[in-house]
Amino acid sequence: MSPAASSATRPSTLPPVRGRLTAGAPLAPLVWFKSGGAAEWLFEPADVDDLSDFLAALDPAVPVMGLGLGSNLIVRDGGVPGVVVRLGKPFARVERLDATTLRCGGGASGILVSSTARDAGIGGVEFLRSIPGTVGGFVRMNGGAYGREVKDVLVEGEVVLRSGERRVLSLAELGYTYRHSALPEGAIVVAATFRGHAEAPAVVQAEMDRIAAEREASQPLRSRTGGSTFKNPQGHKAWQLVDAAGCRGLTRGDAQVSEKHCNFLLNLGTASSADIEGLGEEVRERVKANSGVTLEWEIQRVGVNP
């Protein structure tokens, strides 16, 4: 069902909310690639109760997905059916629970988490400074960088299931593997508790600065990109395989494999999501032909083609 067609069905099919519910909401402005179609519905809940009540009353057949900063995401050009949930300011708070522990809202950015940890004298979460996303995405994906992953610091995650049920999941229950969790389809991460270690703020800041400088030197940070495109296969670096297959700088329309870091795809201007995803698939084919390794997407691809 198209967003335009679905708007007339709202009174009978979608529950009332206290937050904001928008029909046919363009998603391209909300994702880093600046491409893709619209959400059939975009829901920005007022608080956890608003989200829980909405999902509990929503027809179970309606698909639901969460959207953070949109940094590791391709939204296909036909848009996303169902409801896209975006956690705003009410979910972006970070608070210190004790000398080494933070409780972070699902909409809080990695920079906010690491900066709050620094100010509180908590080390160990500096790596979140380097991941362009929100806590909800980190927890779902077991986000990681510079030798650390969310599983190394997570105590528990607070989620609202597709049914509207609120659950607190332990580290073990999240079933983490490399860039993957056992979170069920449609579950929205609303908060997480991270535990680090006591550290002088100046030491934490120095590590954050080191990470920032390394990213600046090696990644196309000021581009329309989706971050790391492919997972690192066992025993390999994805970028090296892409480079060895002759894909550095490869283009399709306005989509390009970054020349600075070839595990990044770029939108040079007016690339469609089909251009970007198609370029990624071409890279996978070339790498398979060259090295025999099948690259697995790290970027999430959602929605439908036109």
From Swiss-Prot:
Residues 34-199 form the FAD-binding PCMH-type domain. Keywords: Cell cycle, Cell division, Cell shape, Cell wall biogenesis/degradation, Cytoplasm, FAD, Flavoprotein, NADP, Oxidoreductase, Peptidoglycan synthesis. One of its GO terms (molecular function) is UDP-N-acetylmuramate dehydrogenase activity. Its main location: cytoplasm. Its cofactor is FAD. It is found in: Cytoplasm. Residues 215-234 are annotated as: Disordered. Pathway: Cell wall biogenesis; peptidoglycan biosynthesis. This is UDP-N-acetylenolpyruvoylglucosamine reductase. It comes from Rhizorhabdus wittichii (strain DSM 6014 / CCUG 31198 / JCM 15750 / NBRC 105917 / EY 4224 / RW1) (Sphingomonas wittichii). The gene is murB.
